[in-house]
Amino acid sequence: MSQVHALSDDQVGQELRKMTAFIKQEAEEKAREIQIKADEEFAIEKSKLVRQETDAIDSAYAKKFKQAQMSQQITRSTMANKTRLRVLGARQELLDEIFEAASAQLGQATHDLGRYKDILRDLILEGFYAMNEPELVIRARQADYDAVREAAGWASAQYKHKTDKDVKATIDAENPVPEGSAGGIIIVGGNGKIDIDNTFEARLTLLKDSALPAMRKALFGENPNRKFFD
């Protein structure tokens, strides 16, 4: 039968020191593991925060850059539109000045009576063809009545020669064209319901509408944005 010997105080002290050293070593190793893990987690979290901040900065910069681009585009578009409107306005002013100058010179055609009679003949004959009626009324300035009668006689003969139809034209003395008119005539048919305004002012307005595209092209060149032409 074995005997159990009691440990001496020295032996107990040694065992305690061994256990203490072991526990201390375990604690230090555990502490190192915890520190390493904490450092790793800190590094990961730090990297995540840096990445988030970087992304936020990049996003904010991209947003500001996009806003700056849009603002620049809007500014360019606004300036281009203002410039285009100024150019169009200047062009329209030039066209208006041209027609105003033409309007101011309309009355000069009546100064040469021979030339004016030729014009009246053409205007009256044109009205005869357009109306194609046997009886018509001509309105004119009182000062032009004699010239109009002569021109109407010539136009009636030409109309008869070309169409083999007679046309009787009388002057409406009760409704003359205002003396302030530059000249020309108004032919009335359809029992007073239809009229053709061949006064100089009306012809200039008609010319303005019909010749405007050609004048724009002649003065300002081809419009690259125009798809349809008159």
Curated annotation (Swiss-Prot):
Record keywords: Hydrogen ion transport, Ion transport, Membrane, Transport, Vacuole
GO CC term (a single one): fungal-type vacuole membrane
Predominant location category: membrane
Places the protein is found: Vacuole membrane
Record keyword Membrane present: yes
Membrane topology listed for this record: Peripheral membrane protein
Primary role: Subunit of the V1 complex of vacuolar(H+)-ATPase (V-ATPase), a multisubunit enzyme composed of a peripheral complex (V1) that hydrolyzes ATP and a membrane integral complex (V0) that translocates protons. V-ATPase is responsible for acidifying and maintaining the pH of intracellular compartments.
Listed name of the protein: V-type proton ATPase subunit E
